[in-house]
């Protein structure tokens, strides 16, 4: 039996990964992390979606220690989430240092427990938000270290790594879940479901991708299929 663990926030990217994983694996587990995030409404959204989509199990792990160590606008109410700035340089204040290091490591431990061969994460390098822990180089390096440390070949899969947001919408549509992802996921840094607040970087990236996809579905769908190998 093929098993996978999805790092699941209830947002657009991880929900799209879950939708695909449910088609590719016999048994899919979800793991969600409570780190005292500003947008912790995503935890309830993740619970609802994991149940609705048919995950075998959904575990919510308390990692609030991360909140004490990592200073970010997503972990401190005193630091405002900035509006989207197209020319912004450097690492944004929404970056939570160590978050994906911790999430992927704990997800791998959980995968070891449930005998899953893969950990799936929705990180993306094509139009990422300036986060160093979304890079392919980082994921591969951590995957190697974790596999060595556990003496087990647990594979980190990144199905969105080389597709952009428009193509991520196309992937959801390919599996017949465009409306679900559009209306029932929570991507917004300010914690608003669906289209979100419309001002933060996460909402802007999501909206621009959707508009691009809806404006030229055939072209974007074809590009997504070419990059992912889907037919």
From Swiss-Prot:
Pathway: Purine metabolism; 7-cyano-7-deazaguanine biosynthesis. Pfam families: QueC (PF06508). It catalyses: 7-carboxy-7-deazaguanine + NH4(+) + ATP = 7-cyano-7-deazaguanine + ADP + phosphate + H2O + H(+). GO terms for molecular function: ATP binding; ligase activity, forming carbon-nitrogen bonds; zinc ion binding. Keywords: ATP-binding, Ligase, Metal-binding, Nucleotide-binding, Queuosine biosynthesis, Zinc. Its cofactor is Zn(2+). It comes from the Bacteria. Binds 1 zinc ion per subunit. The keyword Phosphoprotein does not apply. ATP binds at residues 8-18. GO terms for biological process: queuosine biosynthetic process. Its EC number is 6.3.4.20. The keyword Ligase applies. InterPro entries: QueC, Rossmann-like_a/b/a_fold. Zn(2+) binds at residues 188, 197, 200, 203. PANTHER family: 7-CYANO-7-DEAZAGUANINE SYNTHASE. Catalyzes the ATP-dependent conversion of 7-carboxy-7-deazaguanine (CDG) to 7-cyano-7-deazaguanine (preQ(0)). Belongs to the QueC family. NCBIfam families: 7-cyano-7-deazaguanine synthase QueC, PRK11106.1. This is 7-cyano-7-deazaguanine synthase. It comes from Escherichia coli (strain K12).
